[in-house]
Amino acid sequence: MDKLVIKKGSALNGTVRISGAKNAALPLLMTSLLTDSPCRYTNVPRLRDINTTTALLRELGVEVALPAPNDIVIDASTLESVTASYDLVRTMRASILVLGPLLAKQGKANVSLPGGCAIGARPVNLHLTGLEKMGAKIEVDEGYIRAKVDGRLKGARIFMDMVSVGATENLLMAAALADGTTILENAAREPEIVDLANCLIQMGAKISGAGSDKITIEGVETLNGCDYAVLPDRIETGTFLVAAAVTGGKVRCTNAAPDTLDAVLDKLEQAGAKITTGEDWIELDMEGRKPQAVRVKTAPHPAFPTDMQAQFVTLNCVAEGTGVITETIFENRFMHVPELQRMGAEIALEANSAVSKGSSSLKGAPVMATDLRASASLVIAGLIAEGETHVNRIYHLDRGYEAIEEKLGGLGAIIERVKE
């Protein structure tokens, strides 16, 4: 098993190219199951979760080719199975996204109940009740979701009683091939939803309202293939910007999407950073200054993203003043706090908030990554901690960050991946 060894270095400085978004790429790859024509996806990040997804598709009998490092071509006309087994699904929650496409195209699907990061209950009931409203018959048996439909799914008005990105994605894909019009009420508004809708529209789907809380889908009988570039990763972008701010550096992120990061950029400016943006780049300048502590409350897009919460906890640890981070999306998402405390951070957990007394003097220590974004917060802490920090269990990190040690190293960080 690998770990990262990090030593305190100088401020980060330079340019880093942002990868395609994991959270956009995973549902995009599933759109291939809606058509018998080949689909080509570009700007796909090389990540553990992407490898899991392609393995899952191959298990279904789908042909998957990788003509270039960040390109994937999928031909689902060779599909042989509608069963997504426990062995693969247990490692990644997004595997549930095969359910809607398989059911819509094949009329049946058997999908193991999913796994992924251990950051609280993420129930799949919204996926299931939505599909049932479209005419699916579903039962959960021996750890598997077994779904079938006679003929095509039927368009329906579906109100989700809580905002769910995954359920919105699953139902959006299923509705693309349904008979009639589907209206998704209280839909998720994330940029990755818009990206998925744009890809489906390129394939011939009729969708309006993506990016709002009401999405309308007029079902069509068949979809075509696609040639589609994955949206830049706003969370990776935010992570590098926080790392630059914490180290007092100046970093430009290229191949970025500034309009997907409004809430994060606003908080970085509140922390004292100078932010400049172009059409596809963002630059943060914190040279000669120390961050100011900020108050952050996570909420569904377009508010502050929960996936940036851990990184801002680290920022508040070393900032001037007292900062408060309140988590409203997931319970049990402060597992990075005890690890930061091992490094000397003064953080108090109060209900669903992390209160950081700033100006902590962090010391290098062996720490353990507990989930994807928590591991990023520990890496950032290691960049400014005195001594040497060992971040263990970085398989979490590899699920969502492409070559993070190489990218940070290119900005001047002293970081290496070693075998334990």
Swiss-Prot record:
Binding-site list for phosphoenolpyruvate: K22, N23
A molecular-function term among this protein's GO annotations: UDP-N-acetylglucosamine 1-carboxyvinyltransferase activity
Q: Where in the cell is it found?
A: Cytoplasm
Q: What is the purpose of this protein? A: Cell wall formation. Adds enolpyruvyl to UDP-N-acetylglucosamine.
**Species assigned in the record:** Alteromonas mediterranea (strain DSM 17117 / CIP 110805 / LMG 28347 / Deep ecotype)
Q: Keywords in UniProt for this one?
A: Cell cycle, Cell division, Cell shape, Cell wall biogenesis/degradation, Cytoplasm, Peptidoglycan synthesis, Pyruvate, Transferase
Question: Which class of enzymes does this protein belong to?
Answer: transferase
Which SUPFAM superfamilies does this entry report, sorted A to Z?
Answer: EPT/RTPC-like (SSF55205)
Protein's recorded name: UDP-N-acetylglucosamine 1-carboxyvinyltransferase
